[in-house]
């Protein structure tokens, strides 16, 4: 189904008892201006523009880059979508504006250092540390283009639509027949025929066909050579001078490729990320922040998902996904507890460990040491089973800690939910 494929483009979700919650994947997401610079290196047509982090830099950019432009596009730079319809906490409406050149400096001053709230940031919003000043393009057509990874074809999948400029979900609903999918053979790479199919699906009105084919091939080259997990151009614009231009782009990169993409990963802006996820990544923990009240620490992704489901079934809401893995050290367990207790929304913590490679006594020692370092103000429910379970239970019993023990997962979830509402 088209919608199923499109759902993989920009985000995924955790299914918790039949309800979907946002999941931030372990991947690098870079700012729009950084993506434009990267695309330019591959010969991809992008608008002329420059980023500025202060009013003085804005003034210099207007003078040196846009000395004769009458209108300028001023774009707030945050790692979230929906900027155009967002609202600054200062009251300014919209994170993207087209203004007269002489007004750009004063507008940028109202954006820089302010918090922008969009449908993707949550009510806390994100701080705007830079603005991206771009030339105003004369557009004759807007299209949609994306490359993502498809499990069904076990390779890159190009998705294109002759309509663009709005969310792909809306496009899929309004114009399902206009969306095409072109799977690419990962061994052969993109061929002229593949690129031609994409161009035919985009149906540009005036752009040169061969030049358009070359642009598609360059986008695919960027996707592969940069280890992207997503390259989304919306809109892929057709300009009055008969060119295809990546007017707005979103690029995500596989975290597993950090060792060979050092230049790209140096672009990471941790100020835009959840500080809990940043701390977890440093400790080599698989953590994803959610918006519930029960903190979870589990070993194994499957068990973690099941734990979240059962919490939901008992009427609770998980505050996070946290998989400590099968070889976590005592220090990592301590760090995990620090992350869980740093969330003010957490009213109870559920530790659910099935010891295979992960030993229950290591988890127990970590819990005890964490209690010594962290002021535990919320109830902790512990369910241990598996390797060294007796040693683990003994360590917890002899610690003198006030813990709520559970015999199985269902019992643990029920007790955690009850503890969270006291």
UniProtKB/Swiss-Prot annotation:
EC number of this enzyme = 6.2.1.5
Domain ATP-grasp spans what residues?
36-279
Concerning SUPFAM superfamilies, the annotation shows: Glutathione synthetase ATP-binding domain-like, Succinyl-CoA synthetase domains
* Substrates-to-products reaction catalysed: succinate + ATP + CoA = succinyl-CoA + ADP + phosphate
Taxonomy, top ranks, is:
Eukaryota, Viridiplantae, Streptophyta, Embryophyta, Tracheophyta
Q: What is its main location?
A: mitochondrion
Q: Where are the transmembrane segments?
A: none
Report whether Magnesium shows up as a keyword of the record. yes
Annotated residues that bind Mg(2+) are located at: 234, 248
Gene Ontology annotations for the cellular component aspect, listed alphabetically: mitochondrion; succinate-CoA ligase complex
Q: How is the cofactor bound?
A: Binds 1 Mg(2+) ion per subunit.
What Pfam families would the database entry show? ATP-grasp_2 (PF08442), Ligase_CoA (PF00549)
- Give the top-level enzyme category: ligase
Binding locations of substrate: 299, 356-358
Q: Extract the transit peptide range from the record.
A: 1-27
The residues that the entry says bind ATP are: 75, 82-84, 142
**Cofactor(s) listed in the protein's UniProt record:** Mg(2+)
Where is it localised? Mitochondrion
The entry's function note states: Succinyl-CoA synthetase functions in the citric acid cycle (TCA), coupling the hydrolysis of succinyl-CoA to the synthesis of ATP and thus represents the only step of substrate-level phosphorylation in the TCA. The beta subunit provides nucleotide specificity of the enzyme and binds the substrate succinate, while the binding sites for coenzyme A and phosphate are found in the alpha subunit.
Q: How does it assemble?
A: Heterodimer of an alpha and a beta subunit.
State the UniProt keywords alphabetically: ATP-binding, Ligase, Magnesium, Metal-binding, Mitochondrion, Nucleotide-binding, Transit peptide, Tricarboxylic acid cycle
Q: Which family does it belong to?
A: Belongs to the succinate/malate CoA ligase beta subunit family.
> What is the protein name stated in its UniProt record?
Succinate--CoA ligase [ADP-forming] subunit beta, mitochondrial
List the GO molecular function terms: ATP binding; magnesium ion binding; succinate-CoA ligase (ADP-forming) activity
Q: Name one GO biological process term.
A: succinyl-CoA metabolic process
Pathway assignment: Carbohydrate metabolism; tricarboxylic acid cycle; succinate from succinyl-CoA (ligase route): step 1/1
Sorted alphabetically, which InterPro entries does this protein's record hold?
ATP-grasp, ATP-grasp_succ-CoA_synth-type, ATP_grasp_subdomain_1, Succ-CoA_synthase_bsu_CS, SUCC_ACL_C, Succ_CoA_ligase-like_bsu, Succinyl-CoA_synth-like
């Amino acid at each position: 189904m088209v919608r199923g494929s499109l759902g993989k483009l920009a985000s995924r979700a955790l299914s918790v008892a039949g309800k979907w919650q946002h999941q931030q994947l372990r991947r690098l997401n870079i700012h729009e201006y950084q993506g434009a610079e990267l695309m330019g290196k591959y010969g991809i047509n992008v608008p002329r523009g420059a980023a500025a982090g202060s009013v003085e830099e804005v003034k210099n950019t207007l003078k040196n880059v846009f000395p004769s432009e009458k209108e300028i596009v001023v774009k707030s730079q945050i790692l979230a979508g929906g900027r155009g319809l967002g609202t600054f906490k200062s009251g300014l409406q919209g994170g993207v504006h087209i203004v007269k050149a002489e007004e750009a400096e004063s507008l940028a001053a109202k954006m820089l250092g302010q918090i922008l709230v969009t449908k993707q940031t949550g009510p806390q919003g994100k701080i705007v540390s830079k603005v991206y000043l771009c030339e105003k393009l004369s557009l004759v057509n807007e299209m949609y283009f994306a490359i993502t990874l498809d499990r069904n074809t076990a390779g890159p999948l190009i998705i294109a639509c002759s309509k663009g400029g709005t969310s792909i979900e809306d496009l899929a609903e309004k114009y399902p027949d206009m969306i095409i999918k072109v799977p690419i053979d990962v061994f052969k790479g993109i061929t002229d025929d593949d690129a031609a199919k994409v161009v035919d699906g985009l149906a540009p009105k005036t752009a040169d066909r061969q030049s358009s084919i070359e642009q598609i091939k360059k986008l695919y080259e960027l996707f592969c050579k940069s280890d992207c997990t997503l390259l989304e151009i919306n809109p892929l614009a057709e300009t009055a001078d008969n060119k295809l231009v990546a007017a707005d782009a979103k690029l995500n990169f596989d975290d597993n490729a950090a060792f060979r993409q050092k230049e790209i990963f140096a672009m990471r802006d941790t100020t835009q990320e959840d500080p809990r996820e940043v701390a977890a990544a440093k400790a080599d923990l698989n953590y994803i922040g959610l918006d519930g009240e029960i903190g979870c620490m589990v070993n194994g992704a499957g068990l973690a998902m099941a734990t979240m489901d059962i919490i939901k079934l008992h009427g609770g809401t998980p505050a996070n996904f946290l998989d400590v893995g099968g070889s976590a050290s005592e220090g990592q367990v301590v760090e995990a507890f620090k992350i869980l207790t740093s969330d003010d929304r957490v009213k109870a913590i559920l530790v659910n460990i099935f010891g295979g490679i992960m030993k229950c006594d290591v988890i127990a020692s970590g819990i005890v040491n964490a209690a010594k370092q962290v002021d535990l103000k919320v109830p902790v429910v512990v369910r241990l089973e598996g390797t060294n379970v007796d040693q683990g239970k003994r360590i917890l019993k002899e610690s003198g800690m006030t813990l709520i023990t559970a015999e199985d997962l269902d019992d643990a979830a029920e007790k955690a939910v009850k503890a969270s509402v006291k």
